[in-house]
């Protein structure tokens, strides 16, 4: 959930809806324009976080599971929140490789003071041993810029195996 400057609260539902709570009451209609996610197990629409400059740019970030039954992954998108809808939805990160499990996505989002975004990536349960493999996103925390680019001061930036 994320608290808006006006006191409203944005809440994600695993089933795929982004909801608004206003004055301690659920707004009847979900936010429109939310990208489709694949719901099951621990997957669906998972986290929401406001851009550090939300008051001036109205940008939010969502984490969601996407794909089909046999090939799913974690995706992070950013969009402009208009009060009841999302516009200009853009993918900023997609975990690799895909997996066939519906659990252990991670999917938590947090901004650092330098406005880079941290994204937790779960181990996919059946793939937990791959968390030690720097060539996958399993079991990692990824740091990206607000538009999804890799910051020049990221660790392992020039390591070809990563």
Task: Write out the residue ranges for each language-model feature.
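The feature captures the short pre-catalytic strand/loop hairpin that immediately precedes
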Residues: 119-123, 149-159
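Acidic, Gly/Ser/Thr-rich repeat motifs that build Ca2+-stabilized beta-propeller blades
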Residues: 1-128
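Beta-propeller blade signature
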Residues: 74-85, 132-147
């Amino acid at each position: 959930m994320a608290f808006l400057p006006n006191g409203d609260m944005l809440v994600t539902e695993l089933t795929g809806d982004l909801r608004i709570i206003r004055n301690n009451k659920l707004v009847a209609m979900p936010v429109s324009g939310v990208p489709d996610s694949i719901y099951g197990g621990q997957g669906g629409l998972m986290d929401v976080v406001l851009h550090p400059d939300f008051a001036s740019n109205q940008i939010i970030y969502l984490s969601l599971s996407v794909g089909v039954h046999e090939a799913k992954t974690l995706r992070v998108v950013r969009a402009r929140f208009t009060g009841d809808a999302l516009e200009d939805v853009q993918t900023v990160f997609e975990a690799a490789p895909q997996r066939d499990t519906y659990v252990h996505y991670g999917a938590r989002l947090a901004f650092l003071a330098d406005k880079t975004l941290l994204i937790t990536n779960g181990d996919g349960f059946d793939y937990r041993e791959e968390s030690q493999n720097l060539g996958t996103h399993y079991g990692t925390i990824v740091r990206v810029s607000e538009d999804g680019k890799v910051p020049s001061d990221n660790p392992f930036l020039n390591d070809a195996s990563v």
